[in-house]
Amino acid sequence: MPQRHPQPAHPADGIYFGLMSGTSMDGVDGVAVRFETGHAPVVLAEAFVGFAQSLRDALFALQQPGDDEIDRESLAANALVARYAVCCHELQRTAGLSRDEIRAIGVHGQTVRHRPERGYTRQLNNPALLAELTQVDVIADFRSRDVAAGGHGAPLAPAFHATVFGAPGETRVVCNLGGISNITILPGEGGDVRGFDCGPANALLDEWATRHLGKPYDDGGKFAARGTVHAPLLDALLDEPYFAAAPPKSTGRDLFNPGWLDAKLAAFVQVAPQDVQATLTALTAVSVAREVATHASGCKALFVCGGGARNPVLLDALRHALHEAGVLASVDTTAALGVPPQQVEALAFAWLAYRFTGREPGNLATVTGAAGNRVLGALYPR
């Protein structure tokens, strides 16, 4: 008799792809992951597909108002999705999957505007084209429903972090060091999960490295390690209302962009480039540490994901800043919890697609400030 595969415990169980291109805009991270009710997610494959400089330039240009935006945005979205499709095909090949084995692709898109205070957030994407190129269902536009419910639409990863990284009896913080830094506070016993954006991270570090090294990022923090933190400049950088704002809050390149940095540096033209890089590293560390001290002072363990997890100088700066803020927490990457740091964000959007398929909420209203928990996303059938 032919073998019968057991029915999934939950109708949404199965294999999903997650795609995430963040504020660093260097490329797209992808994962193929199996979700099964009652079990930890199982990653079947991962991939990274870089963006050509022409696409990066187009995406950076769209961060600020300009001429002919609709045409430029549409063309950039098509070019972006072409790279997403390459990532999906690589995941499919590596995992040895047929299209019919993939339940859906959860894709974030590329944020070009984030203005929740004005009632909108804009992630550049063309999910209909991605569905056509992959012949797989696509779930996208995760942030809009939260914004429609009065929330910030960000961060969305905390609900996933709580599912995967929470531990009874231990308060943990998960810190994503992407273009922007954000934290998720996971209470060990009782209390609400909280999370919010802290400030700039790789967005400004990469920008400064590109200007002065001609490279897309400061590899291993070596450029910063050659410099010394300039205390008056650090104070000037921290003199930004966002850092003092209470959560829920979210930010992005709308605020922390090259123009913001140049305006702050105007009074510090004598500071050497390597010292600026060291000071930007300290800015990231201090802005995170202050938020942890204020909202999770009892935290004993902080786990880092995102591109910053590969920067030992930044991690050391974070340890120092936490100590200075009176937080006695160990600092490690999420690899210590079994999830490589470069996979976490893409996994979160695969999980959001899984939640959408089961018509279950993907946000946490206590994190985003929305009127309630909502099912997030929109389906583009293959």
Curated annotation (Swiss-Prot):
The protein's Enzyme Commission number: 2.7.1.170
Q: Pfam families from the xrefs?
A: AnmK (PF03702)
**UniProt catalytic activity:** 1,6-anhydro-N-acetyl-beta-muramate + ATP + H2O = N-acetyl-D-muramate 6-phosphate + ADP + H(+)
GO terms for MF: ATP binding; kinase activity; phosphotransferase activity, alcohol group as acceptor
InterPro entries cross-referenced by the UniProt entry: Anhydro_N_Ac-Mur_kinase (IPR005338), ATPase_NBD (IPR043129)
Q: Which residues bind ATP?
A: 22-29
Top enzyme class, one word, equals transferase
Q: Does the keyword Nucleotide-binding apply?
A: yes
Gene3D superfamilies in UniProt = 3.30.420.40
**Which pathway does it serve?**
Amino-sugar metabolism; 1,6-anhydro-N-acetylmuramate degradation; Cell wall biogenesis; peptidoglycan recycling
- Write out the entry's keywords from A to Z: ATP-binding, Carbohydrate metabolism, Kinase, Nucleotide-binding, Transferase
According to the lineage, what is the superkingdom? Answer: Bacteria
Example GO BP = 1,6-anhydro-N-acetyl-beta-muramic acid catabolic process
Q: What does this protein do?
A: Catalyzes the specific phosphorylation of 1,6-anhydro-N-acetylmuramic acid (anhMurNAc) with the simultaneous cleavage of the 1,6-anhydro ring, generating MurNAc-6-P. Is required for the utilization of anhMurNAc either imported from the medium or derived from its own cell wall murein, and thus plays a role in cell wall recycling.
Q: Please report which protein family the annotation says this sequence is part of.
A: Belongs to the anhydro-N-acetylmuramic acid kinase family.
Database matches in PANTHER family: ANHYDRO-N-ACETYLMURAMIC ACID KINASE (PTHR30605:SF0)
This one is known as Anhydro-N-acetylmuramic acid kinase
Name the gene that codes for it: anmK
